[in-house]
UniProtKB/Swiss-Prot annotation:
Catalyzed reactions per annotation: D-glyceraldehyde 3-phosphate + phosphate + NAD(+) = (2R)-3-phospho-glyceroyl phosphate + NADH + H(+)
Main location: cytoplasm
A Pfam family recorded for this sequence: Gp_dh_N
Protein name per UniProt: Glyceraldehyde-3-phosphate dehydrogenase
Upper classification of the organism: Eukaryota, Fungi, Dikarya, Basidiomycota, Agaricomycotina
Length: 290
C-alpha cells in the first residue's frame, strides 16, 4: 500500500468480515494505530481513499481475481504451499502466484540472491521464508567473498500465530504446545537447508534450528561459519558494508549502532547486519548476527 509501484486490488479472507478488517488494520499491537484513513464504502475496504475488493472464499479456485484485474496473487495463508494447491488461484484469472513460504515443489527465489534464475514461464513460485530471506543474502556475501566450508544457524524467532498462550495439545510438536509467554521454545526450521536451494554452492553445508521467544516482532539470525579464506572480523564487516551500499542495497542493511530488537520494527530490509554483535574465534571461524 505504501509502494507506488504496487496497486493492491483485492484481498481474500474467509474468516473475518469487512468491519473487523477495518478494526484490525486500524489498530495494531506492534505497529501502533494506522495514521491514515480506513473505512467501508460500496462494500469495499477503503484505505487512504484506495478501494480494495474483498473476497471471502475458502477455496482459492473460487476467487475471481480476474474480475478486478489482479495479475499477481500473494498466497500467504500458509495452507496452499504446493504448486498444485497454489495453482488454484490461476483458475480465477490470476497470472502469477507468489507463495510467501517455503514450498516442497515450487521454484524458490530470494531477492538479491537468485532472481537471475527466474524464468517468466513460471506461474507459481515461492519467495521462501522470512528466516531464509534474512540468512541467504548474508550467506551469499560471505560465500562469494571468503567461501563457506560449513555453518550452523540459529534463529531467535518472535512469536507466531500458531503458538499457544497457555499449554495445550500439539501432537506433532510437543514443545510447540507449551505456553509462549515465559518460555524459550526450541523448534525446527528448514531455513538453513533452504539456502542450499537458492545458493547451490552451499547445498549440504548449512543447517540450523529455531528458538521461539516471547516477543511480538523482530527475529534474529545467528550464523556460525567456518571460512575457506582467512579473514579478520573487520574484513568481514567491510564485505557486508560494501554489499549493503552496493549491489544488495535495500536488501541488506548494515548497522554498527548499539541496537536492540524493537529498533528494527517496520524495517523493509530483508537482513540487517549487526556489526557490533558478531564475534570471531580465529580468522576461519566467526559468528555473524543479522
Amino acid at each position: 500500500l505504501l509502494d507506488p509501484r504496487v496497486k493492491v486490488l483485492a484481498v481474500s479472507d474467509p474468516f473475518i468480515d469487512l468491519q473487523y478488517m477495518v478494526y484490525m488494520f486500524k489498530y495494531d499491537s506492534v505497529h501502533g494505530r494506522f495514521k491514515g484513513t480506513v473505512e467501508i464504502k460500496d462494500g469495499k475496504l477503503v484505505i487512504d481513499g484506495h478501494p480494495i475488493t474483498v473476497f471471502q472464499e475458502r477455496d482459492p479456485a473460487n476467487i475471481q481475481w480476474g474480475s478486478v484485474g489482479a495479475d499477481y496473487v500473494v498466497e500467504s495463508s500458509g495452507v496452499f504451499t504446493t504448486v498444485d494447491k497454489a495453482s488454484a488461484h490461476l483458475k480465477g484469472g490470476a497470472k502469477k502466484v507468489i507463495i510467501s513460504a517455503p514450498s516442497a515443489d515450487a521454484p524458490m527465489f530470494v531477492v538479491g540472491v537468485n532472481l537471475d534464475a527466474y524464468d517468466s514461464k513460471y506461474t507459481v513460485i515461492s519467495n521462501a521464508s522470512c528466516t531464509t530471506n534474512c540468512l541467504a543474502p548474508l550467506a551469499k556475501v560471505i560465500n562469494d567473498k571468503f567461501g563457506i566450508v560449513e555453518g550452523l544457524m540459529s534463529t531467535i524467532h518472535a512469536t507466531t500465530a500458531t503458538q499457544k498462550t497457555v499449554d495445550g495439545p500439539s501432537n506433532k510438536d510437543w514443545r510447540g504446545g507449551r505456553a509462549v509467554n515465559g518460555n524459550i521454545i526450541p523448534s525446527s526450521t528448514g531455513a538453513a537447508k533452504a539456502v542450499g536451494k537458492v545458493i547451490p554452492a552451499l547445498n549440504g553445508k548449512l543447517t540450523g534450528l529455531a528458538f521461539r521467544v516471547p516477543t511480538n516482532d523482530v527475529s534474529v539470525v545467528d550464523l556460525v561459519v567456518r571460512l575457506e579464506k582467512e579473514a579478520t572480523y573487520d574484513e568481514i564487516k567491510l564485505a557486508v558494508k560494501e554489499a549493503a551500499d552496493g549491489p544488495l542495497k535495500g536488501i541488506i542493511e548494515y548497522t554498527d549502532d548499539l541496537v536492540v530488537s524493537t529498533d528494527f520494527i517496520g524495517s523493509t530490509a530483508s537482513s540487517i547486519f549487526d556489526a557490533g554483535a558478531g564475534i570471531q574465534l580465529n580468522k576461519n571461524f566467526a559468528k555473524l548476527i543479522s
